[in-house]
Amino acid sequence: MLKPVALSNTKRQHILFHGVILFIVMLIASACTGQSQESSIPEHLNNLQNLVVIQQNSLPETSVRFTRDLVINDNDSIKTWFNDVTSGGFAFGGSGWFAGLEVDDAGKIFIGDRYDNVIHIFDSTGKYLQRLGGEGRGPGEFTGILDIKIHSDQLFAFDYFQFRSTFFSLDSHDLIEVRDVYTNRTPDREELREWPSRPVSLISDDLFIVSYKNEMKNANYGTENYNLDQEILVRYYVVDREGKIRSDMIDELKDMKNITAVVDGNHLFNLSPLPFLQQPLISVSDKGTIFTANSDEPLIKMHASNGDYIKAIYIPMEKKAMDRDEIINLFAEDDEENTNLLLHAELPEKWPALCDIVIDDEGRLWVATITEDEDFMCKWWVLQDTGEPIATFRWPGNRSIEKIKNGYVYARETEVSTGLQTIVRYRIEMDG
């Protein structure tokens, strides 16, 4: 049995002093970003390794300002390039035409265009220089650009119809080479042999993120194979250009959510992702670090370029309540088909938590969360790759951030009244 020990006043004060210091340290640690605290996260995340929780009561003091610096509006060159017919009248536009944006060290801007299967090039002042590619199957031509990327001082574009990557010189813009890509080969994993697959993101010139799912979307309403009303899970792997899977499963995410309705005998459903519905989010940094998330949960997972899990970041938040009238008002008044869909479809009770994840050239995460504002606004968190908050700011939903480099944000902006889209560059100013 332990015996009590008598303490002098000096020793009591010494212990009390250190106890106070320890309490203060613990208080500070709990107020800042840290390891998961069971009281602030959902139960299913309690066993997730290396989980960092962003504490809402420890907002960073750094302020962020954006100064509009450049608007790309060379109408003679781009013509109807920004009029995105896939938006379906949605006020914040679609991205069907857009196949990525890259910026080189000299500030030249490269923009992929799926409609014309070309890459537009502008100098740092917004002057139109030229276009690369064009519709066709010859060297340097495309039939379906997935994305563009700068890697090893070259610009390359992946063509998902021809399964090949085309490389251009950053300086002269000359064609360098064309490489076949075999990501459509039967995978060397028994459990994935019969699963449809498609490349979804570029990691490097030889590595891709490829999705696999055990069933495709089936919109044949009234048949036994109809599944738009079901949740489909999608698995993601790192695959090289020879078609060999180079990773364990990176993540398993929920596929894009569909809402459906039958109106006057017509089966209606959304054809593309919408910000008020769940969708998988995948972002890859310039160095190949992979970030994944389901938009309906404020949890972002970080993976190495080989697919290995590193950590996860969780942002506790109350999700925005869904309001049918508010959603309908996001579409054009003459968009009868989507209005009918939204009037009659069963909608989720809440908006998703996230609308975007972007990685800047310094490896920082820019995470867009959906706010309670009546107008569609996003609250962006700027985080170190450790999860430490740097700054927050609010940004309109019609400004989609596509690239952050050299102290600038490059946004794809939709004119709400017309649906026309332009690329706008903003200078970033951070204080604090």
Regions found by a protein language model. Give the residues of each.
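Eukaryotic scaffold repeat domains enriched in small/polar residues
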Residues: 32-432
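Exposed boundary/loop context
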Residues: 12, 25-27, 100
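Bacterial N-terminal signal peptides
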Residues: 18-30
